[in-house]
């Protein structure tokens, strides 16, 4: 008999060799029906996996991220199966699950069209009804290559040949279709209830511009049609909120072919940016942080010492100065460490909290660039904290509370993920255990719920990631807290303890916005361009009905500016209805309309973007109202 520990801590005994699907049935027939995959000792596996030793088990459904991923991974295979049925000459490349669905890359001597997608989708629906079992099998390297050569699948042959010697080579078969795949997958194609093919794109083989351009088909999959309908509605809403479209319409930023991935901020965009950065500085000063600034370009030797050269080189830009090799910084931490090393520190100085709005450059493939969300140059709102091991819990709790304050201000819900040691990492098992437990204890002490993301930590330490949920249900990873024992070791950082001896500090890397540019993009989409008054580039649009109100309009404008209210005037010879509509399209929070009645009464007619016509009030009353709104940062 073997002992299986369930997620809730319950221990059950079963015969050795039992399949996970049978365990799911014994736990609950309802769970068996919903089950898509499972985690055994943290590793995601098929439900048909047999268990031969004591293990921890979590049954995954569509409510779990890896449950969704597994279902959508199977969706990608069903897409490939449908394409091969309809167009047998097409060659298969790769087809993974992604955050919101899946894709598959194909080589074809024709161009896929939207009409073809409809045919392919209809074929997928047939495959769902056929309810093929997904059967995993393994082959020795030579047999695997032979199988793929017989099927004329050149890309699969290349993938197999690139696998290390001794690597398990596995395939999945569903009906008349077989694909090279590590898995896992759902038990049968009938588990995928609703599929939608979404779009077409080009993609270079292996993401390398030197390789052949393939055709990529994107799709998504759900267990219920109602979930698919909800998702499709979200996509339509997202199109309306696209920050690239709104950024252009609202004159916030632009991106030019002279600098792909390098955004240009316009005056109105700079207002939003400066407000976010000023608020960031104010809150960090209150929380005991000291701001620093470090250079953009630093000697190559620094990046060898930090480990970035070994772990991050392909994402970096380089230059040569005075016959020496330099790198443009992809991260702020090594420069911040040099600031710490510049002085001797006592235990009385700790914790030391150094913050930096530092510009970093990271190479992204051109196909991955996306407005402000994925760029090559951005400002990271970093902070690096240095502390003793005894201070870890208290400092992490303080950071979490600060992050919570920021996200609540902007109206975001969020969830937290604790990411543990990746395969490509530095440091001892003991340090990783202390660091990971430190983060766990901080989260547990304030009752913060979190998920564990095994193996997704930074190469130098475990981390807590904060995922924002926007108003249409999408998630964005922004803030992060990373505990680091490695950098202090590599840079020989120290402080003088109470015993007069040198000790090694613990270092924490931390962001809130993540990337300022990306956060602005998220806010544009969160608010659909209609920023709250305190953040709006233009807070008031002042407009006259005829030229006779011009002098009064200028007095009102002056009074607003004296009170630091951002105002624009519209004195064009246009109908007032046209001016109002334009201001509404520009998402201005308030419009003040001045006619002869307002001039005579010394009032302003107020129209709110949110509440419509508010009637005529005194200018003083309006100024007091809007100043309170700005001061309280009302959403």
From Swiss-Prot:
Q: What class of enzyme is it?
A: ligase
Catalytic: region residues: 242-532
Keywords recorded for this protein, A-Z: Aminoacyl-tRNA synthetase, ATP-binding, Cytoplasm, Ligase, Metal-binding, Nucleotide-binding, Protein biosynthesis, RNA-binding, tRNA-binding, Zinc
CDD domains per the record?
TGS_ThrRS, ThrRS_anticodon, ThrRS_core
- This protein's major location comes to cytoplasm
One family from Pfam that matches here is tRNA_SAD
Its BP terms in the Gene Ontology are: threonyl-tRNA aminoacylation
Q: Which InterPro entries match?
A: aa-tRNA-synt_IIb (IPR002314), aa-tRNA-synth_II (IPR006195), aa-tRNA-synth_II/BPL/LPL (IPR045864), Anticodon-bd (IPR004154), Anticodon-bd_dom_sf (IPR036621), Beta-grasp_dom_sf (IPR012675), TGS (IPR004095), TGS-like (IPR012676)
Please list the residues that bind Zn(2+). Answer: 333, 384, 509
Q: Where in the cell is it found?
A: Cytoplasm
**Named cofactor requirement(s):** Zn(2+)
- SMART domains registered for this protein in UniProt: tRNA_SAD
> Start and end of every TGS domain?
1-61
Keyword Coiled coil: yes or no?
Answer: no
Q: What is its EC number?
A: 6.1.1.3
What does it catalyze? Answer: tRNA(Thr) + L-threonine + ATP = L-threonyl-tRNA(Thr) + AMP + diphosphate + H(+)
Extract the GO molecular function terms from the UniProt entry: ATP binding; catalytic activity, acting on a protein; metal ion binding; threonine-tRNA ligase activity; transferase activity; tRNA binding
Cofactor info, note text: Binds 1 zinc ion per subunit.
Entry similarity comment: Belongs to the class-II aminoacyl-tRNA synthetase family.
Q: How does it assemble?
A: Homodimer.
Instruction: Note the NCBIfam families from the entry.
Output: thrS (TIGR00418)
What name goes with this protein? Threonine--tRNA ligase
Gene of this entry: thrS
């Amino acid at each position: 008999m073997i002992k299986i520990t369930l997620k809730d801590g319950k221990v059950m005994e079963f015969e050795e060799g039992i399949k996970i699907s049978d365990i799911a049935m014994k736990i609950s027939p309802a769970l068996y029906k919903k089950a898509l995959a499972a985690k055994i000792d943290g590793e995601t596996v098929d439900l048909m996996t047999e268990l031969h030793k004591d293990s921890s088990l979590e049954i995954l459904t569509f409510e779990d991220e890896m449950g969704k991923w597994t279902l959508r991974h199977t969706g990608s295979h069903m897409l490939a199966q449908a394409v091969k049925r309809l167009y047998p000459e097409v060659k298969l490349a790769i087809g993974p699950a992604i955050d919101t669905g899946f894709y598959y890359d194909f080589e074809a001597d024709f161009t896929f069209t939207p009409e073809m997608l409809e045919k392919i989708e209809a074929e997928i629906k047939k495959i769902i009804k056929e309810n093929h079992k997904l059967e995993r099998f393994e082959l020795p390297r030579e047999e695997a290559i032979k199988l793929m050569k017989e099927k004329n699948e050149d890309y699969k042959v290349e993938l197999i040949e690139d696998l290390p010697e001794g690597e398990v080579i596995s395939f999945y078969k569903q009906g008349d279709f077989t694909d090279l795949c590590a898995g896992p997958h759902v038990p049968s194609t009938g588990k995928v209830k609703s599929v939608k093919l979404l779009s077409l794109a080009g993609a270079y083989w292996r993401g390398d511009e030197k390789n052949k351009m393939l055709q990529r088909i994107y799709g998504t999959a759900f267990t219920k049609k109602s979930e698919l309908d909800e998702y499709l509605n979200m996509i339509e809403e997202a199109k309306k909120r696209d920050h690239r479209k709104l950024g252009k319409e609202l004159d916030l930023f632009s991106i030019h072919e002279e600098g792909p991935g390098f955004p240009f901020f316009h005056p109105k965009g700079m207002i939003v940016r400066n407000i976010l950065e000023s608020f960031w500085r104010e809150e960090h000063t209150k929380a005991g942080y000291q701001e620093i600034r470090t250079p953009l370009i630093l000697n190559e030797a620094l990046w060898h010492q930090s480990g970035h050269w070994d772990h991050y080189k392909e994402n970096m830009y380089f230059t040569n100065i005075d016959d020496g090799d330099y790198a443009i910084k992809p991260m702020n931490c090594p420069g911040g460490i040099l600031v710490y090393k510049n002085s001797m520190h006592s235990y009385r100085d700790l914790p030391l909290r150094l913050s930096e709005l530092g510009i970093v450059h990271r190479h992204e493939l051109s196909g991955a660039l996306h407005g402000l969300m994925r760029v090559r140059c951005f400002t990271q709102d970093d902070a690096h904290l240095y502390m003793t091991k005894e201070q870890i819990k208290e400092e992490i709790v303080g950071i979490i509370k600060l992050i919570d304050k920021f996200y609540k201000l902007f109206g975001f819900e969020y969830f937290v993920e604790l990411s543990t040691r990746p395969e490509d990492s530095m440091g001892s098992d003991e340090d990783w255990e202390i660091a990971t437990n430190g983060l766990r204890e901080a989260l547990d002490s304030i009752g913060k719920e979190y998920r564990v993301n095994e193996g997704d930590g930074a190469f130098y330490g475990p981390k807590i990631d904060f995922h924002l949920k926007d108003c249409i249900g999408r998630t964005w990873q922004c803030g992060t807290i990373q505990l680091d024992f490695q950098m202090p070791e590599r840079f020989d950082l120290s402080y003088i303890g109470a015993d007069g001896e040198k000790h090694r500090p613990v270092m924490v890397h931390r962001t809130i916005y993540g990337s300022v540019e990306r956060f602005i993009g998220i806010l544009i989409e969160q608010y659909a361009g209609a920023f709250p008054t305190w953040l709006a580039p233009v807070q008031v649009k002042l407009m006259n009905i005829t030229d006779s109100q011009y002098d009064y309009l200028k007095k009102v404008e002056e009074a607003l500016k004296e009170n630091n209210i951002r105002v624009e005037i519209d004195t064009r010879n246009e109908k007032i209805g046209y001016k109002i509509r334009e201001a509404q399209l520009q998402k201005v929070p308030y419009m003040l309309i001045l006619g002869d009645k307002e001039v005579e009464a010394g009032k302003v007619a107020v129209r709110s973007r949110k509440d419509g016509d508010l009637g005529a009030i005194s200018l003083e009353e309006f100024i007091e109202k809007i100043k309170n709104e700005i001061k309280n940062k009302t959403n």
